[in-house]
């Protein structure tokens, strides 16, 4: 599932969701792109 990274923009309707929901921690080579901590899932994005 896709999720909204912090820098995708504040407007949920017009924002592009560039993150991917990952359960627990992000995969290797990916980084968490939200400041909000949720224990079950992280919003991750491939490292540039």
Curated annotation (Swiss-Prot):
Name of the molecule in the record: Delta-stichotoxin-Hmg4a
GO cellular component, as recorded: extracellular region; nematocyst
Function: Binds specifically to voltage-gated sodium channels (Nav), thereby delaying their inactivation during signal transduction. Its toxicity is weaker than that of RpIII (AC P08380).
GO molecular function annotations of the record: sodium channel regulator activity; toxin activity
Predominant location category: secreted
Keyword Transferase applies: no
Disulfide bridges in this chain: 3-43, 5-33, 26-44
Family according to the record: Belongs to the sea anemone sodium channel inhibitory toxin family. Type II subfamily.
Keywords per UniProt: Disulfide bond, Ion channel impairing toxin, Nematocyst, Neurotoxin, Secreted, Toxin, Voltage-gated sodium channel impairing toxin
The organism of origin for this protein: Heteractis magnifica (Magnificent sea anemone)
More info: A synonymy between H.magnifica and R.crispa is controversial.
Compartments where found: Secreted; Nematocyst
Xref: Pfam families: Toxin_4
GO biological process, one term: regulation of signal transduction
């Amino acid at each position: 599932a896709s999720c909204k990274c912090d820098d995708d923009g504040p407007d949920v309707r017009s924002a592009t969701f560039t993150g991917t929901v990952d359960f627990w921690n992000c995969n290797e080579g990916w980084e968490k792109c939200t400041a909000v901590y949720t224990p079950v899932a992280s919003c991750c994005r491939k490292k540039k």
